Amino acid sequence: MANHDPISDMLTRIRNASEKRHETTKVPASRMTRSIAKVLQQEGFISEINEEGEGFRAELVLSLKYSGKHRLPTIRSMQRVSKPGLRIYKNTRGLPKVLGGLGVAIISTSKGVMSDRDARREGVGGEVLCYVY
């Protein structure tokens, strides 16, 4: 079955796996999902990214992070902002600060996919893909 929104699919798989305290989760690989996974790793939400398979069957294996002795997920919430039916674009000044800077907005810019902090530093705006905190 065709997936019409791979970003929402990725966020849902990560959210479900972290709620069930799984060590890893698999996500279909694409340039966009790789870029989002790299931003999540840079921001400390996932620990490792591995790739399995080749071609259209390739999958990213994401190692999820937990904190404390009760293994609380580092990802509390993931929300899709810009959707296929309603795209949300922001300029540099309009980029959101998630939870006053504690969370991350993932932005697709002309310079690639990056966090809101990096986009402000680069002075670029773009499509607000999701919020993670």
Curated annotation (Swiss-Prot):
Entry's Gene Ontology cellular component terms: ribonucleoprotein complex; ribosome
InterPro entries per UniProt: Ribosomal_uS8, Ribosomal_uS8_CS, Ribosomal_uS8_sf
Bias (Basic and acidic residues) ranges: 16-25
Biological-process GO terms, alphabetical: translation
Keyword GTP-binding on entry: no
Purpose: One of the primary rRNA binding proteins, it binds directly to 16S rRNA central domain where it helps coordinate assembly of the platform of the 30S subunit.
Subunit structure: Part of the 30S ribosomal subunit. Contacts proteins S5 and S12.
Family, similarity comment: Belongs to the universal ribosomal protein uS8 family.
Protein's name according to its UniProt entry: Small ribosomal subunit protein uS8
Species of provenance: Synechococcus sp. (strain CC9902)
Gene from which the chain derives: rpsH
